[in-house]
Structure formats: C-alpha cells, structure tokens
Amino acid sequence: VVSVIKNLSNTSCPWDLAEFGGVARYASHWALGVIDGGGGRCFPGGHASAGFAFVGGYFALRRKQPVAARWWLAGAVLMGLVLGGSQQVRGAHFMSHTLWTGWLCWTTGWLVALAAVALRPRIAAFLHSTPAPVAD
C-alpha cells in the first residue's frame, strides 16, 4: 500500500524544498495533483513502513495471546518511529509522513484482519469439502 501511494505521490522530500537548499516549493501531501517542482515520491515514508508493517501481527495475536499482541504492537510502533525518525534526521521526511505511514499500516492490518474473520467460514468449508470426481 505504501509503495503504491509513494509511486503516485507528487510530494517532494524536505531536502528537495527551496527552504532547505533544494528547488521544490512546499505543497501539502494532500494537495493531489499539485507538482511542487521537485522529484516527488516522498510520501508516505518507506523506511517507517518497514517497522509499521509489523502491526498486522497484533491483529493476528490479539484474541488468543493479548499480552503478546500488545508487546508485538509496541515493538512494531517503536521500530516504525525509529526508522521514520532516522529519515527525519536525514531530511528525507517530515514527522507527518511517519505518522501517516503508521496509520496506513494500521488500517491495512485492520482491514486484512476483518477480511480474515469474514472469510474464515468459507475457507474452513473449502478445506473440508470433498473434491468432485473427475470424469475420464
């Protein structure tokens, strides 16, 4: 999800902005279709998503192992913030990029968990069905 949005994004990195020695002018990452004069493809944060991607494990663990799920979530959020923070120090992202990346990863994990719960009866029925004989 993050890679797709990033490839479609016109938002440039902070280091590309004129205020910080680049050539781009600031434009909100929500100003869709606005070309800021820079390279774009800077929103959301790819490095942060490497950590935040693991929030999906929380949804897998939360019902049967809630304590482990909370620890898993804390680790994933911490890694996302550390990786996103390291990019901010370099000038590659704003804090908003990191926070929105976390939200995107959380929402994706939540939607996948909802789909898994909704599809569980169908998957179980499929796995326990007897295949029809094949005619020669």
What spans do the regions from the language model cover?
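Membrane-embedded catalytic cores of phosphoryl/pyrophosphoryl-handling enzymes
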Residues: 27-136
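Transmembrane alpha-helix/helix-exit interface in multi-pass inner-membrane proteins
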Residues: 1-20
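Juxtamembrane inter-helical linkers in multi-pass membrane proteins
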Residues: 20-27
